[in-house]
Amino acid sequence: MPAPSAADFARLRSLVAIEDLDARQSRPIEEVFTGRELTTIPVGTAEDVAAAFAKARAAQRGWAHRPVAERAAIMERFRDLVAKNRDFLMDVAQAETGKARSAAQEEIVDMMLNARYYARQAVKLLAPKRVQGLLPGVVKTVVNHHPKGVVGVISPWNYPMALSISDSIPALLAGNAVVVKPDSQTPYCTLANAELLYEAGLPRDLFAVVPGPGSVVGTAIVENCDYLMFTGSTATGRTLAEQCGRRLIGFSAELGGKNPMIVTRGAKLDVAAKAATRACFSNAGQLCISIERIYVERAVADEFTAKFGEQVRSMRLAATYDFTADMGSLISEDQIKTVSGHVDDAKAKGATVIAGGNIRPDIGPRFYEPTVLTGVTDEMECARNETFGPVVSIYPVESVAEAIEKANDTEYGLNASVWAGSKTEGEAIAAQLQAGTVNVDEGYALAFGSTAAPMGGMKASGVGRRHGADGILKYTESQTVATSRVLNLDPPLGISGTLWQKAMTPMIRAVQKLPGR
C-alpha cells in the first residue's frame, strides 16, 4: 500500500480555512519513511485566524440552539465514516508521522470511541440538572451548561488525529465552534477528518483548520479563543497558560511525562516483558503516556531484564503501510538528535545498552532502534528528562515501597503502569502513585481507552482532563438558576427585621440537619 495520492492531498488541501490558497506561501510535507516530498500546505497568518474565528462565531450561535440530539447524530455519522474510511486515514497518518500501522490504528480507535461515547452521553451530561436548593420545597435550583463560544485547539504531531479530533468532538457537542491549529508536520491528518466531519453534516465554519507556525497561528488562536485545549510540551504549556491567564479564559492541557512502570516479584514476568514492549515503544516512544522508567524488585530484576531485552531485540522495524512492522520511524531529525543524544550521553557516563542503541538509516532516514538501558544514574540526561522516543531505563529496587518512592520522584505525573502478583496488590500500589492514570497489568491503553473516565496529568503533566464528564463540561459555562416558589428572604409585610431574623435562625438550623447538607 503506497502513501495517499497527489489527488487526495489536493482535495484535502482545499479544506484549509485560508482564502486564496494558491497565492499563499506554502511549506513542504514529507513522507517520513523516505524523506521525499509528498505535497505542500499553505501557511496561515494571524489574519487568517481572525477571519476563521469571525466565521466560527457567526456559525456557533445557530449551532448552540440546535438540540443536543441533533449534534450527537452528526457525531454518530462521523464515527461510521471513520470506520468506513479507516484504511485511508491510517495511510495519511503513516505518511505524515512515520508510525507503524498498529499505532495509526490506535488513532482510529480513539476517534471512534470518543465519538460514540459523547454522542451517546451528551444529552444526559448537558441537560439542566436539579440540585438541592437553600430551602427544600421553597427554592428550586437548577444548573445549566452553556457553550464557551469558540474553542481553540492546538494539537501535536505525535497523535495528530486523536489529539485534534477527539478533543474537538466534545467541544462541538457542547455547542461550541472549534478552530484548530494542527502541527506543521501533520496538517493532513486533521484535514482528512475534517472532510469526514463535513460529510457527516457539520457546517464547515464550525470546524476550521488553520495550519501555520505556533508563533503566529498559535498565538493568534490564544488571542481569539474563548477556551484553549493544548497538547504538547510542559514548557510551551506554561507559556500558553500565562497567555490564557492574562485573558481570563479557561485552559486545559496534556503535557510532558516521564512515566514509570513497577514490576513486583510476584508479577508474571513473561507477560509483563511482552506488554512492556508496546508500553515503551508504541509510535517509537513518541507517546505522552509511554513508559520511560521501569522499577523492578531486585529478586526478579535480572530475569525480567533478560526476558524484556529478548522481546525488544526481536521487534521488527520497517517502513511499510501494513501491519508487519512492530515499530516505525521517528518523525524528524530533531527527534533523532534528542534520542541519540540521550543514549550516547548515558553510554558515555557508564550505562549499559541491553538492546538497541543505534540509528538505522538502512531502513529509513529517521529510524532508531528500540533501546533498553541499565545502570542509568541521575547525572545522565535520560534519567529525569523526557526522551519522547524509543528509550527506556530499568532500575532494580529493594522493595515495592522504594519503587513507589522512585516512581513519584519526578516533576511529572501523567501515566503509570503496575505489574504485581495480584490485582489487589496492583490496585493498592496504583493508589499510591502520583499519576493521572494508572494501568494495572497494562501499559497505557486500558486507562486511555476508558473514555467514560477522566484522563490527564498531575503536577507538571497537565491541567484539566479529557474524556468522561470532565472532558465535555470543561467546554461549558455552568449557570445556577435559583427560583423562589413561595417567598424570598426579605421580611414579609408587617414583620420587623429583628423578628424575621429570629424566625429565620431555627429554620436555618433545621435545614442544616437535612440529608445532603
Swiss-Prot record:
Going by the UniProt record, its keywords in alphabetical order are:
NADP, Oxidoreductase
Identify the catalytic residues: 254 (proton acceptor), 288 (nucleophile)
Pfam families from the xrefs?
Aldedh (PF00171)
State the Gene Ontology terms under molecular function.
Answer: succinate-semialdehyde dehydrogenase (NADP+) activity
Has the keyword Translocase been applied to this entry? no
Reactions accelerated catalytically: succinate semialdehyde + NADP(+) + H2O = succinate + NADPH + 2 H(+)
Q: Which Gene3D superfamilies match?
A: Aldehyde Dehydrogenase, Chain A, domain 1, Aldehyde Dehydrogenase, Chain A, domain 2
* Residues at which NADP(+) binds: 157-158, 181-184, 232-233, 255, 386
Give a short account of what the protein does. Answer: Catalyzes the NADP(+)-dependent oxidation of succinate semialdehyde to succinate. Although it has succinate semialdehyde dehydrogenase activity, is likely to act physiologically on a different aldehyde(s).
Q: Which family does it belong to?
A: Belongs to the aldehyde dehydrogenase family.
Annotated protein name in UniProt:
Putative succinate-semialdehyde dehydrogenase [NADP(+)]
Species of provenance: Mycolicibacterium smegmatis (strain ATCC 700084 / mc(2)155) (Mycobacterium smegmatis)
Q: What is the lineage of its organism?
A: Bacteria, Bacillati, Actinomycetota, Actinomycetes, Mycobacteriales
- Its gene is gabD2
